[in-house]
Amino acid sequence: MRIHPASLVAVLTLTLASGLVAQRVKTTDPLTAYLGHGVSHPLAIWRANTISDVRYDLSLDVTAPDSAVGHVSVRFKHSGNSDAILDWRGRRLTQIMSNGRSLPLSAANGAHIRFPVKLLEAGENSVELWFVSDIAPSGASIIRSHDQTDGSDYLYTLLVPADADQLFPCFDQPDLKARVTFTLTTPPAWTALANGSIVRADSSAGRITRHFTETRPLSTYLIAFAAGPWQRTTSVVKGRSISLFVRKSRAKETDADTLLALTHRAIGWMEQYFGRPYPFEKFDLMLAPAFPFGGMEHPGVVMFNEDRFIFRERPTLPRRLGRFSTILHEVAHQWFGDLVTMRWFDDLWLKEGFATYMAAKALAELEPSSDAWKTFYQSNKPAAYGVDQTTGTTPLWQELANLDQAKSAYGAIVYNKAPSVLKQLNYLVGEKAFQAGVHQFLSDHAYANATWQDLLGEIGKAGGRSLDAFGKNFMQRPGMPEVQQRLTVRDGKIAKLELVQKPAQALSGPAAWPMRTEVWIEYPVAGGNDASGPYEPYVTRKTGEANHFPVELSAVATEVVAARGKLAPIFVFANYQDYGYFLTLLDSTSVSSLSSGALGRVGDGFLRAMLWGALWDQVRDAQLAPDRFAELTLSMLPYEMDEQVVPLLLGRLERSIRAYLAPAKVVTVTANAEHTLWDGARDSRKPYGIRKAFLDAFIGLASSVDGVAKLESLLAVDSAAGEPVRDPTRWSVVNRLLVLGAASAERAFAAQMSRDTTPDGRRRAFVAGAARKTAAVKADYFARYFADKGLNEDWASGSLGEFNALEQQDLTLPYLRPALDSLPFIQANRRIFFLGSWLGAFINGHTSDAALQTVKKFLADHPKLPKDLREKVLQNSDEIERTVRIRKRWQ
């Protein structure tokens, strides 16, 4: 099946334009403005003022393969002398009743259902609707995953941020919370789970109907159920029962006992920290096949990505910590997001930032040896800074006119900047005030909604200080500061150390951000242990001087008075322990020392990771040559023994070689990298996690004749360096051979498909197929991204990187403009993270000025592109702009 990209985009553009014309029709009916696409903010405000005490009694029959037959009774209190409007975008309605009286189906317009005031009562109302909703692998509110291993089907819902109205008619906005009662009819061999607990089950005529308890108040995006022949494992600890559901074919691979134990620990810690018990009736979790993101916090039925939670090969420390962090994140949501929910999706950061930050706090206490704050830095700061220093950045609080734009709010600002800012807030006010404010916030708004002002108000009150300036600068102000270190040394002493703020982008305005940070000063040690001395890998150095000082940043320029008169340093770092939210611009002395070997003597792994990050920022700003960074990295990697730092270094090494290096230098640097990585992967003296990271990096970089031969050798053996070569690693090798167009690639691909017939193997085969180096394959995949209704989003998003491999830019450049032209379709028809993945892959699969000009021309050709989409394009095009600049600077 093939569709020409230009034809497809023309249809999408015409459809979008027709919709916009239709919306311009004027009318004197004041409610008509509310009946357009999505849920507008004015509609949401109006309904929140006229509708209350909502209850949904929802019945669904999911015995058919592609549709669910449903009935919902909506009870609510209505005030005011006006109509009521429900939201509905499902397949079709079959009947509408309002307080026992019929409404014509024409009351629905494809987006909403209007109930005239004459059919409503002042006070209690009951409306009933009969409907049919879609079931499909993608693009539907009920996702169907077919397991080819045993022929089973599994269903689950995913309604975030505003797709509940595809499942059933409802008031689909977060501040109209409702109590929900499910009734689910399924095939008799299936299990069903939902937000509530099962109270009874009735069997008849080859089906089973389960009735569930009424929930506590929930926002519509949190309503959820799942159905299928799940295998269930239950654990009871201190009277709390938690069940894990996983599909039958993967049950033996699942470490159910570990996952349940981690969940019990997570809930216990959160209950203690928040000072209130788990706020919902039950807690079950399920591993969802083809789940399009990491997890979703539905109360009572928390869903996780199956592939991220089932380890098909021995997991490294980062993978184990990542899985536990995801559990902690979703458990934290039960209080922050579920118990107390943002009033509108402009405050999305409130729940996501808090969940990530609380997960880090919990991990630090529950796993003291995990270096949780180093993990937090590596997981959040590079991603946050990478977006927040672009011209497409947004404030944490993102103005949102309509919920159909809410998907655009998801990204690094919400998930990575927000928790980083909360860490600064916690440090600023102190732990006692922070926790007391959180307690009061949860108490005041339990089972209701709140705003960021409510949160800062309580924390500020607990700390006895106003946080108005903090809110203005970190919640409402776009962008971020850069902090330049200015070091003056005289007679072997520090004469002055000054920290100077400036905005990373002019859109932030010139004012300083109020912050507190800690400054680290690395002094020379007697015996010549300085940047020019003999190399001493990763030792902890001691000095009689105080090494770090707290500093309040309240002005554009701030002197570190405590540093005055101290020994002239080897280097300085302005954000020790990562409390500040700013990009550190190192002084020339520090850059010279760190890039000449001093970095190798820093014994603190957390500090070392941040210093590597500061040097990488020098590379991205075209101030440090990428080949110099690669050489430094390769010289230090053999000595680095931190399992969390090594993967970060290897990722940057790969980017510097594959994207930033001038073509004339690629062959030499790649050969050095292949040698270092191959030796490291086979060095049995290294911890497993480091050897695995070296092997993964080798697979991602190998391109020489010798490198390809080594890749092929991995497929010919059962083990390497004492470790089994499992299928996930074999697939990575196959992917690389396909990207390179190696002579053995197709044979290896066919052999691996025959070898690995598991559900995960079939997914990986689809992903690998996108890497095949032919124009016909690219055309076929691009068409399937739009036209294949059986293609689920997890598979599609997973293949985007292979489709856009840097080594195949000549094949993929023709698809860059069609990919950009399709953005309205992607936003309307794909889930929350797909848009960012799409843009990141298609734009940053390129390093050429021609690709950059394609992006710029797209923006110039669409001056009326919706603001949120323009921002997403600008966020993602920043990297290719840097790439082109770096390659020109260091060619």
Label each residue range with its predicted role.
Residues V69-W88:
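Ligand-binding face of N-terminal immunoglobulin V-set domains in extracellular IgSF glycoproteins
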Residues G70, L159-A162, P169-L328, Y357-A360, ...:
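Hydrophobic helix-coil surface modules that form long, contiguous segments used
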Residues A22-V69, T149-Y154, D172-P174, L467-A469:
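N-terminal, polar/Ser/Thr-rich
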Residues K118-T191, Q505-T517, I521-Y523:
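Surface-exposed, acidic/Ser/Thr-rich flexible loop segments
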Residues R2, T183-T186, A201, V246-K248, ...:
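Non-catalytic accessory/interaction domains
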Residues S7-G19:
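Bacterial N-terminal signal peptides
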Residues V21-A22, A33, F212, S243-A506, ...:
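Hydrophobic alpha-helical and helix-loop surface patches within well-folded domains
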Residues V25, A84, W88-Q148, P169, ...:
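A surface-exposed beta-strand-loop module
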